[in-house]
Amino acid sequence: EWEEWLLA
């Protein structure tokens, strides 16, 4: 994904 670090 990409939001893994966004909403980490």
Swiss-Prot record:
Chief location category: cytoplasm
Example of a GO cellular component annotation carried by this entry: lysosomal membrane
Record key words, sorted: Cytoplasm, Endosome, Lysosome, Membrane, Protein transport, Transport
Annotated compartments: Cytoplasm; Lysosome membrane; Late endosome membrane
Assembly, per entry: Homooligomer.
Protein function: May play a role in clustering and fusion of late endosomes and lysosomes.
Membrane topology, record value: Peripheral membrane protein
Organism ancestry: Eukaryota, Metazoa, Chordata, Craniata, Vertebrata
Name the UniProt record assigns to this protein: Vam6-like protein
Alphabetical GO biological process terms: protein transport
Superkingdom per UniProt: Eukaryota
